[in-house]
Amino acid sequence: MFGKPEGKPKGLNWLYRDTYIGKRKGITLGFSFAMQNDIDQELISDTQGPAPGINGQGKPSPGAGSVQVRVPYMILPNPITTPEVRNHPVDMRMYGADLAIHYGPLSFILEAGQHQFKNVFLDAQKLSEDFKNNWFIIKGAYALNPKSTTVFEPYVSYYIWDPDIKEDSKGRAYGDAANFIKGNKAGKEKATLGKISVTSLGVNIWYTKAKLMSLTFEYQIINEERNEITPLPFNSALSFSRHLPLIFLRFCSQSFPNSSPYLKYCPF
C-alpha cells in the first residue's frame, strides 16, 4: 500500500464501492491464495438441474447441474447416477491479484484470478481431469464534483468469466457457466457452456451528507460464448446501509434472442 491508507477517511472503503470519491490518494496491491485438498467430488457438483452433462445434441437430461451455478459448484457427472464420484477426492486451488488506484477524483480497479479443480472424475476413460476457471475485472471511474454533497461519478467496467469446459469420452460437456439461449455447436437444441463477458457503462450518484444512500444507473452489454444477449438492458440501483454491508436493488430490462423483452427484479 502506498500513499494514504485504505479506510481513511473512516468508513469510506465500505460506504462507497471501489471509490473514495476524491478523498484518497493512494495505491493498494493485493494477492490471494487458497487451497483445500480431498474434497468429495459430489460436494462441488450441482444436483438441481440438467445432467449428466450437456450431450452432443444439446439435450439436458434431469439430475445434476444448473444454469445458475457458479464457483464452487459445476456441472459434473451426477453422483446419483455415477456412484464413482462419491468420495472421489478433488483438490481445489484459488489464485488472485488485485490493484486499486485512487488519485483524487480518479478510481481504477483491476482484478484477475484463477480457480482450479484437480483430479475431477468424468468417466472410466477420463479418471482425472483438471479444470482451470479464469476471471478478469477492470473498472475506471471519475468523480465529476467530489466536493459537492451530491457527487456524480461516471464509470466503465469490463468483466470476463472464462471457465474451463471439458468433454468426456462420449462428447458430453462439463464445467461451469451454462446457458440455454441458442443452439449449441452442433446447431441443435438450446444448451451450451462457455465464456461470459460483461461491458458496463454507468453513473453513480452519491449523497455524501447522509452516507446511507446512492443511486446507480448502468447499461450492460452481455456476451456469452456462442450466444449474445441483445444489448438493451438498463439498470438502476438503490442502496442503503447502516453499519451493515450495502444492499443493492437492481432493476434490469433485457431482451433475449427469439423472445420478447422482459423486466426482472434482481437484488445483488
From Swiss-Prot:
This is Uncharacterized protein aq_1121. InterPro entries: Porin_dom_sf (IPR023614). It comes from Aquifex aeolicus (strain VF5). It comes from the Bacteria. Residues 45-64 are annotated as: Disordered.
